Amino acid sequence: MANESTDVSKLLERITIDPDICHGKPCIRGLRYPVNMILELLSGGMTNEEILADYNDLEAEDILAALAFAARLTQVKRVQAAL
């Protein structure tokens, strides 16, 4: 379990937040690829391989990092409907 936690921590280091890049949205390695864009591509049905082919400067670990970041965000104690 500790090894898994270390792996996730290593992945999360790939996520950067810089007010000068994409208006401060969480991005992949300081590049102009917001985490939400990666998640939208995946939820739209693109495979990891298709994403990597379309965005040459991304690495497989970047996609895993986006998923790990999203998973971490869902670990909240309470979610309030935004309706």
Residue ranges and their predicted role:
Residues 1-83:
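Small, basic N-terminal interaction modules of short regulatory proteins
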